[in-house]
């Protein structure tokens, strides 16, 4: 039985749906003038992405460009501010998604390189003159895929107890947004997708007031790759781009130290880049100018095809291509070092993890201690023999020790063990590191362990993405009350700066996290028993993964 869930499966978890927008005839509905840019008219939305009725109708403006589109000679260039336009543009339907794997949420006809657009959802009936708190959500998808359909902004806004503005948007993904290479390093073209995100933040600061949003009350949030993105921005309070563009942050299954983010010259990235350029017929031994010209003129279907092929060639061993790189723009310093130096934005934050993150990804065919260690060593080649020996002890081998907490796997001997170790490496301990650094610097911080299934098979536990639909109070989740509770905490954080102020009735008070306590408190969200608990999951292992001496070997 193959237990690895690929990104295509993730994208297919719910079918793509067009927004149910109410047509407005006659005068333009909710006409908004964006100073120095142009005017757009809005619409209303009354249903979720899965065609269920929203609790209340929301105002919406959709498919608005926030940049000059990266097409033609602008492919593989940093995004630029859009040019002004005359007249009124109708903003009543979603814009194109960025080029990526063809899947149910991102069919071919929905895709375009001209994809840098955003959507705004706002509580209906509140005058635009009243400036409301704003949530800007960054979609996930391993930096390989994702779109507006990854986060139901209308549902999040409609379910908020207090008036709110929600923004979601597209940024370039896979090779068009992230192509680690010496060429891109030399030409200053690394981390284009992260730079797209920052341009959107700047656009929000300039124009969100026209949509009735408060630019001084912006929360950025994201899950998975979106959460890693939040971490990259949160831990970048240094250099020339250190102006605060947000007031709060939600790191959902993500962190600046999640997984690993090597630099442009990482040997595996060179191998992947060589495969990429060879497929496209671009000789990377020519001058930078010649190679870039070839890449910019390459057929877009060929770019989609080779990006998808290379991603899945490395998916089983979790050494993904097309990632943000340390040393590149907005990520000049390793995330761990920025934490040690305190060069992050000291603004309130939430960090979250689901209980069994790694079971969404890890393989079900490892049987021996050697295979367990080889798998981790392949992901982090700089680990020493001593490191590997310590890992073997930290995660007792169920084939050797009957009392190992990782015994009784549902399939291969090592499945529970490798899932726990990779969860700690990629998500759980990095989330703890973020909470520790923020809270010990005096920043209001809250941490959550999400322990609620959403129809995954029992052998997968509570895997990565289990919390997705609960975030926006999804109407068809396995445990609807958890949707109310979880969304209540998050929307309260956005609107009041504290997850408790407008939490769902009957849900417990969520205490702030204090990383310098021996056992800091967090909340566990689970059916029938959401409660406060101590943050003690695999405590010794997390200290190992978070060790500053080891961080460079882990590319954290």
Curated annotation (Swiss-Prot):
A Gene Ontology term for the protein's cellular component: extracellular region
InterPro entries in the cross-refs: AB_hydrolase_fold, CarbesteraseB, Carboxylesterase_B_AS, Type-B_Carboxylest/Lipase
Catalytic EC class: hydrolase
EC number: 3.1.1.1
pH dependence: Optimum pH is 7.0.
Protein keywords: Glycoprotein, Hydrolase, Lipid degradation, Lipid metabolism, Secreted, Signal
Name of this chain's protein: Secreted lipase 4
Organism (species): Gibberella zeae (strain ATCC MYA-4620 / CBS 123657 / FGSC 9075 / NRRL 31084 / PH-1)
Gene responsible for this protein: FGL4
């Amino acid at each position: 039985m193959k237990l690895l869930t690929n990104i295509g499966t993730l994208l297919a978890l719910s079918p793509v749906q067009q927004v149910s927008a109410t047509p407005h005839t006659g005068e333009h509905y909710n006409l908004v003038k964006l100073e120095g840019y142009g005017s757009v008219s809005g619409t209303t939305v009354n249903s979720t992405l899965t065609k269920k009725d929203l609790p209340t109708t929301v105002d919406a403006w959709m498919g608005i460009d926030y940049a000059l589109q990266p097409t033609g000679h602008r492919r593989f260039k940093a995004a630029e501010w859009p040019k002004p336009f005359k007249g009124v543009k109708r903003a009543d339907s979603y814009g194109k998604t960025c080029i990526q794997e063809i899947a149910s949420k991102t069919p071919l006809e929905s895709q375009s390189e001209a994809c840098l657009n955003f959507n705004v959802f706002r509580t209906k009936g509140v005058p635009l003159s009243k400036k409301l708190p704003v949530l800007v959500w960054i979609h996930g998808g391993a930096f390989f895929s994702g779109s507006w359909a990854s986060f139901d902004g209308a549902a999040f806004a409609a379910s908020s107890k207090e008036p709110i503005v929600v923004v979601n948007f597209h940024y370039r993904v896979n090779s068009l947004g992230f192509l680690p290479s010496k060429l891109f390093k030399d030409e200053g073209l690394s981390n284009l997708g992260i730079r797209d995100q920052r341009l959107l933040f700047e656009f929000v600061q300039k124009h969100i007031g026209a949509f009735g949003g408060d630019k001084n009350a912006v929360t950025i949030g994201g899950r998975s790759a979106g959460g890693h993105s939040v971490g990259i921005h949160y831990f970048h309070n240094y250099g020339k781009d250190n102006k605060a563009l947000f007031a709060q942050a939600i790191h959902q299954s993500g962190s600046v130290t999640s997984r690993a983010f090597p630099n442009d010259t990482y040997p595996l990235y060179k191998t992947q880049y060589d495969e990429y350029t060879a497929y496209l017929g671009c000789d990377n031994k020519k001058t930078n100018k010649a190679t870039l010209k070839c890449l910019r003129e390459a057929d877009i279907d060929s770019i989609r095809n080779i990006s998808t092929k290379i991603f899945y060639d490395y998916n089983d061993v979790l050494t993904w291509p097309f990632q943000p790189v340390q040393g590149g723009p907005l990520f000049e310093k390793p995330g761990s070092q920025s934490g040690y130096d305190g060069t992050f934005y000291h603004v309130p934050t939430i960090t979250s993890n689901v209980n069994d993150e790694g079971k969404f990804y890890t393989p079900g065919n490892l049987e021996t201690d050697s295979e367990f260690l080889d798998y981790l060593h392949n992901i982090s080649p700089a680990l020493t023999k001593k490191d590997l020996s310590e890992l073997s002890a930290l995660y007792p081998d169920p084939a050797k020790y009957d009392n190992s907490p990782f015994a009784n796997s549902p399939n291969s001997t090592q499945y529970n063990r490798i899932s726990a170790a990779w969860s700690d490496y990629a998500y759980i301990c990095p989330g703890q590191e973020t909470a520790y650094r923020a809270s010990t610097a005096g920043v209001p911080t809250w941490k959550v362990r999400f322990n609620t299934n959403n129809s995954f098979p029992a052998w997968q536990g509570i895997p990565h993405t289990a919390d997705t639909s609960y975030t926006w109070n999804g109407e068809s989740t396995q445990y609807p009350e958890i949707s109310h509770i979880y969304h209540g905490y998050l929307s309260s954080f956005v609107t009041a700066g504290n997850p408790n102020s407008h939490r769902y009735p009957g849900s417990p008070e969520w205490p702030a996290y204090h990383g310098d306590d021996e056992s800091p408190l967090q909340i566990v969200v689970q059916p029938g028993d959401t409660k406060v608990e101590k943050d003690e999951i695999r405590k010794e292992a997390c200290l190992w993964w978070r060790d500053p001496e080891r961080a460079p070997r882990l590319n954290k």
